[in-house]
Amino acid sequence: MDEKNKKASDDIQRRRFMLTINNPEKYEMSHEKIIEAIHSAFAKQGILYFCMCDEIGESGTYHTHIFIMITKKKRWSAVQNAFPHAHIETEVRGTAQEVVAYIKKEGKKNAEKKETNLPNTFYEEGEIPTFYISNKRAEMLE
């Protein structure tokens, strides 16, 4: 089922979200506006960490990847309301470090796409947690 067409019964709650906004300038979503929207939408849940970076994909689409970690769960629909033009992944796989490496296109796994990232567009707030947050528990990383 398409993420944008979920039913209310599928309105799951998560602590980690990965968003992609295609053509953010079309929706006037500068980094400043995105930061403002994150602070506004997630303040009550306690923002642990977030980062973003711009990229031009292989098909030529300019887009912004955003990764957000919060202390309390938030409903998918609330995130969709805050970012109506974003594709939202609720099943974020990997540790925070792995997701940040993906966004930055760093490491062996992401090296082939390094040139798609736009220089000087990476932004982050908070410290990358040294624990893994799943939807059921937090585990210390070794």
Which residues make up each language-model segment?
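Catalytic "initiation/cleavage/transfer" segments centered on a nucleophilic residue
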Residues: 1-43, 71-142
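A generic structural motif
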Residues: 62-70
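Intrinsically disordered, low-complexity peptide-like regions
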Residues: 21, 52, 61-63
